[in-house]
Amino acid sequence: MSINQKRALLVIDIQNEYFTGKLPITYPSGSLANVLDAMDAARAKGLPVVLIQHTSPQPEATAFRKGSKEWELHPEVAARMHDVLIHKSLPGSFTGTELETWLRQRGVETVAIAGYMTQMCCDTTARQAMHLGFGVEFLSDGTGTLSIKNDAGAVSGEELHRAILVTQQARFSRVIKTSNWINQL
């Protein structure tokens, strides 16, 4: 088994909610194009591509409601070849899903994280993967987020994204630009 056969690309929650819904991704620009490039490169090199789709567990939810247009995968992601589609209802892609079993059955040792949002499902999934013994590669420009304001304060998308990347690199992942990741396949 080659090193590439021991890797998989996880494409997390590239759904219309982040483009035409209530949560438009604003940082970094070009993240969708980088995800698509990563998907194409992974397929060309024979790496498994795993699509992950979030569904709100509340049937009356205003975001990620199953069956809604915003819940659907982005059409450019949906049109690309992938090996499996994993459905989840919590930020961690391993929680309550068959993801770990699917990866282990294929001898995957390292996962690359791409998708949305950096600080939620991507960060949580990367941490879970590390806890489960997988190596983790976090695509710095193939993940994205938006500015957030709530009762605890406000943070820009850029600040939030950078803080997660620094934290990921400190302990959980190898943070890498998509173009460098592709060149190393």
Model-derived segments and spans:
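Active-site-adjacent betaalpha module
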Residues: 1-8, 36-40, 45, 62-185
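Short beta-strand segments at enzyme active-site cores
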Residues: 11, 47-54, 139
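Short acidic, Gly/Ser-rich segments with clustered Asp/Glu that frequently serve as metal-coordination loops
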Residues: 17-20
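Short, glycine-rich nucleotide/cofactor-binding loops
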Residues: 22-29, 114-119
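A short alpha/beta connector and helix-capping loop motif
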Residues: 24-51
